[in-house]
């Protein structure tokens, strides 16, 4: 390998065309870029990328093909005070690598240096990029395109969801293959969910601190390679991409969408003491938000923050999202710490990346979900994202928990959240589906732990229980921990049913955490990001079948209520909703201000929810007509017909008018 042809500047990354490979790399401040190719024995050959178009360096290697192992060495100024940290002693991953060989070890040879360059060569231990043939037979695949108003999201971890499932073939448990297996698809269908939202599947790394403690990053929110499927979830690591695509195809055939959690906010290079393995060495000042003193703005809490207002970085991010849609047929994205995407550095609805997505004919048509905050100044941006985005709604989570578990919010506050938080989202042309309602998620207590623990128990994370939020709005019902007497167990069961009913029958887009429908507990750990063990893996043998059936019945009931599926804002007198007191009369101004007590919510005229958040039995007079309790609150063969509901403490019921 003596030289390269000029090649072309687009697309970014290593593109195989059947005859050779085109390499294209963005770096605005580089002075020279070397392509480094490795043989099976690890011997390295270097050659300069010969052409530069604007800020894209590129070249074409004849007769190269899939499996080629490569990296970059990028030359440029070493001027940390100005944000420049070029160090050609460090082998760098292609930011668009479709496959990565090797992990990210805790080894000082990967460090580029803080204020002086580290000249130790890192090639022997650095992860390598690999060329991939992206061809795949998508014939017959048809994205479900489920309307937002009919969407029910199920948030899950590839490994944690499937590793302990006894009916799956042992060889595929914990893998992408398991997601598309008939056993899992049958479960998803019986539960009634419409979309599977996966925690990050792009290749990630464990932080050095965790490695030193013998732990690992389990959730995956520490990205190393945004375009590469993580091989640890593949039964055959060399086929990770195709195994994932096989699963997507199978899920689509069953009418289930696939939404990916993607981390476009920071990288695994962490802070200045972290490794130089990709973006830092390619163009630190362009890829990251750099302070005037040369250090990073840490608006993510992870050591660095991607600068998604730089045109070159915006195009890289856009191509990343297009890869997942075009080549993997995913149906949407959940963006972690998504306020970073809108920073300029202040948050703007017309930030460059938002505009790039809006103008993209493909990305503008998929489901986009924001976690609408980061930890930087002005980072909390709930309901402020562009209209294309739905958003996680922490108001719904907190008010729902406080209503049922702490009884310290008003009926008015609860009703506002139940009605798709219209005070927040009913503007800018947004629909009720813009609020993604949740009572739990991967971070925080599981639903069972919400009713079993008043305090977090994160000692296993190695931070002396300092990590994780202290604002859990939970209630152990008198006994801390899973073990309890029958009276406490019954109160906990009622609270779980009430929270699930609120989640799945409120207006907006519901998101269910995998395992909540089974009674899964993390034993009070509300930040299990580093627990790749039985604490986080769903134990299917211990699942609560009654709770699973209850959850499935609620999801199927949701689809029968027009007020919840039409995706239109409720208006006074439109027949969608009536808010009633225990005597079936409209709530008065004074009653709206009452602390969490009891109320009735009549939906689409024919459906009635009765809610008793008190610790006492409350009799409620139902509205005029003949009402029967419906599953999961009564059996179809023996429906309960009544005019008065004897509401148990912490109780809820749903009726249909005959």
From Swiss-Prot:
It catalyses: Hydrolysis of (1->6)-alpha-D-glucosidic linkages to branches with degrees of polymerization of three or four glucose residues in limit dextrin. Pfam families: Alpha-amylase, CBM_48, GlgX_C. One of its GO terms (molecular function) is hydrolase activity, hydrolyzing O-glycosyl compounds. It is an enzyme of class 3 (hydrolase). Its EC number is 3.2.1.196. One of its GO terms (biological process) is glycogen catabolic process. The keyword Hydrolase applies. Gene3D superfamilies: Glycosidases, Golgi alpha-mannosidase II, Immunoglobulins. Pathway: Glycan degradation; glycogen degradation. The keyword Cell cycle does not apply. The record marks 443 as: Transition state stabilizer. The active site is at 336 (nucleophile), 371 (proton donor). Keywords: Carbohydrate metabolism, Glycogen metabolism, Glycosidase, Hydrolase. Coiled coil: none annotated. Removes maltotriose and maltotetraose chains that are attached by 1,6-alpha-linkage to the limit dextrin main chain, generating a debranched limit dextrin. Belongs to the glycosyl hydrolase 13 family. This is Glycogen debranching enzyme. It comes from Klebsiella pneumoniae (strain 342). The gene is glgX.
